[in-house]
Amino acid sequence: MPIVRYLAMLSVLALLTAPSHAQDGAIKIEKFTHSEWTRGIFSEAVTVMGIGNAKFVYLAGVGAEDENGPRGNVRHHGNFLEQCRYAYDKVKRVLAHHGASLRDAVKVTTYITDLRHRLTLGQCVKDTWGDVAFPTNTLIGVGALAFPEMIIEVDVTAIVAAK
């Protein structure tokens, strides 16, 4: 079984069977908010530790929302490439905060409001990831995202050695 498939299955199993808090030190789940406007609404990142020597990092719905601005303040209105770059810049910052990098990503889900942007998405991905092997990715066309000005959003799962 390829390692990526094994890790993805292990990741899903961990989410389905893990409690919402640590029990007997076996599994530790921590939930994080990195933007002021998301506090009390949802967790932008969740880490799961205690499954072997792995720390799973799950990032939810990273887009071009200004993490330092008011709720719904989206940067680069109408500019797909710049929204993509901004989203992946946030992904890199949040992964780094949790001890991970793009090299540790094993799964990406990309949501875009217009599939005609897929070639521009490809360029953004090449520019962002450089020589890093890109993980599995599912591209999904959607009618809308969290805010009307958003045209791209990504979910990322990464796995690193627990410390």
Where in this protein do the model-derived segments appear?
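N-terminal presequence-like segments and the immediate start of the first folded domain
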Residues: 6, 10-89, 93-107, 113-163
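Positively charged n-region of N-terminal signal peptides that target proteins for export
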Residues: 1-5
